[in-house]
């Protein structure tokens, strides 16, 4: 995406209103601080700073993968508990698609969201990242069916994202078949 510079805009820039509504929350502009980290004390400190910034700037915030919460580690839960610093922020939880298939049903997915006060949940797709990690999840069979089942049963908005390789046309066509609230298209390039 490239923007063309318009040096003679013929408008009052102070009159431009970028506010939008996403999942029932009003944002100052169509911006979301993307998922980066979570699970450890240090990650919790980063999340708190970012969530407070999201609150101050009135933009959304997406948690890093909540996979560490599945082990019920106290520091993991604490690192994702941010409502005290971001009470009105659009807050989105996040779990991997393989974890959805292997460990979670709709009720557990909803419980993950409720545990952190999330307004919705992302399910992240990352087969390329997993393929190059020695300990990565290499079996992706049944992930689409698990995603479909969760989307049909969960009582919170469900969104899908890719963590660094983007969503191709075939994947988007598959996702269009599901009753999900949306997809994040910022996947190419990760958090850069």
Regions inferred by a protein language model and the residue ranges of each:
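A gly/proline- and charged-residue-enriched helix-loop-helix capping module
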Residues: 56-97
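An N-cap/entry alpha-helix motif that binds or orients negatively charged groups
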Residues: 1-23, 27
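Residues that cap or initiate secondary-structure elements
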Residues: 7-9, 39, 67, 99
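Alpha/beta enzyme core
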Residues: 51-56, 84-91, 98-192
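Short, charged beta->alpha transition segments
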Residues: 14-24, 47-52, 75-83, 108-112
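Short, basic, glycine/proline-bearing loop/turn elements
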Residues: 32-37, 65, 93-97, 156-158
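Short secondary-structure boundary/capping elements
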Residues: 14, 42, 46, 73-74, ...
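Active-site cofactor/substrate anionic-group-binding motifs, chiefly glycine-
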Residues: 21-72
